A protein has these predicted regions:
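The conserved beta1-alpha1 loop
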Residues: 155-159, 234
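Lipolytic serine-hydrolase domain surface
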Residues: 22-127, 139-140, 147-148, 168-172, ...
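Short substrate-entry loop that stabilizes the transition state in hydrolases
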Residues: 162-167
Length: 376
């Protein structure tokens, strides 16, 4: 316990001073002049506004004049548009484009949520066919897909110590560096937004599994997305992995091929996943064959996951201790990597310039790593 106190003190100092989201460093591939991710972005997209869709199961305290989201989970799904902007009114598109296609050393602008435009509330027992609001939301998703250069849909699932504005900003900057050519939904599960309330986040993530699984099924059933991709960061794996395992159970009489065609799961990317390694492997076996690919990006020196392993009393999938696995689990991982499009991406600070050895945010904070994420 004595060794844990310095970490607890540091976490306590940081808990009340969450920094704003700044535009992530430009991926290396975009700074060499080899490719301009915004080449196909039409005039309507050449703006500092980067709206993304959102869905949340946060309980709302009051509805008007606008919903006040709490840190409590519910079984309802709220969906709409998150209006996000990069920088303030003085930043123009030309400057943002230059910053996004070069290794400009200047201070990065803040990415901030201006407003949430709630379009629909779908109760836990309510069907889309009985909700005009939900139908309108999914029609908007289809309209966005039709206008996009990429027919796939990406769901971003944030980690712990997060807030609604932060979740929206992270999803928006990811969409921005995808050349704004992909439809992105930020799934804002009820994180308490404090490092000191990590265990609250763990409990809330568990309470969010059913709503997230439902969202994936609703998107598959009500949109024209060719594939549904998921990017889960850190404790977002505690929502995503068990939800996918739940979806891995077929409906009565459903064949595996029919299930695969119904769900249309594409690339599932776990960035620094904060979830028990053994649990992750067990759940992976229930759904990996339904996807195009499952990837885990792991830094074996990740300091955040070292702390999470102490709290959870088990190594995390983003910093795995493979000796914890049974013989059967180890054999499955080998088989999955050879036959089922599963891979572990080792993020080694010794091989990546200027990457902090203990980095947890490497997937968006490092220009060498972030370029490998945005390959959809």
């Amino acid at each position: 316990m004595a060794r844990l106190w310095p970490a607890l003190v540091l976490f306590g100092l940081l808990a009340g001073c969450q920094s704003p989201v700044r535009l992530m460093p430009t991926p290396v591939g975009f700074t060499k002049g080899e490719a301009d991710p915004f080449e196909k972005a039409g005039p309507a997209l050449q703006t500092t506004e980067v709206p993304v869709l959102y869905a949340t199961n946060r309980l709302v305290l009051i509805e008007k004049p606008e919903p006040l989201h709490t840190i409590l989970p519910s079984q309802d799904l709220r969906m709409g548009i998150a209006h996000v902007r990069v920088g303030d009114e003085t930043l123009d598109w030309e400057t943002l484009h230059r910053m996004s296609t070069s290794d400009d050393p200047g201070e990065r602008p803040i990415v901030h949520l201006e407003s949430l435009e709630q379009m629909a509330v779908l109760k836990a027992d309510e069907e889309v066919k009985n909700s005009a609001e939900a139908q309108a939301f999914f029609a908007l998703v289809n309209k966005a897909l039709a206008a996009s250069h990429n027919p796939e849909l990406l769901i971003y699932v944030h980690g712990s110590n997060n807030t609604v504005p932060r979740a929206a900003a992270q999803a928006a900057q990811f969409r921005h560096f995808m050349g704004r050519r992909m439809v992105v939904i930020s799934f804002m599960w009820p994180s308490a937004g404090s490092l000191l309330r990590y265990l609250t986040d763990v409990n809330n993530a568990a309470a969010t599994v059913d709503p997230f699984a439902r969202l994936v099924e609703l998107l598959a059933a009500n949109t024209n997305a060719s594939k549904i991709d998921v990017l889960a960061y850190s404790a977002g794996a505690q929502v995503t992995s068990p939800a996918l395992a739940q979806l891995g159970a077929p409906r009565p009489g459903e064949t595996r091929d029919a299930q695969r065609a119904r769900l249309r799961l594409g690339q599932i990317y776990f960035a620094a996943p904060d979830i028990d390694t053994r649990r992750f492997v067990n759940e992976l076996g229930t759904y990996v064959d339904l996807t195009d690919r499952v990837s885990v990006a792991a830094n074996l020196n990740d300091s955040v996951l070292r702390f999470a392993a102490i709290v959870g009393r088990a190594s995390r999938a983003g910093r795995p201790n493979l000796s914890e696995l049974s013989t059967e689990q180890s054999a499955f991982l080998v088989d999955a990597s050879q036959k089922m499009q599963f891979d572990i991406i080792k993020v080694d600070p010794n091989d990546i310039p200027n990457l902090p050895e203990s980095s947890h945010a490497f997937w968006y904070d490092d220009p060498w790593v972030s370029g490998s994420v945005g390959t959809w």
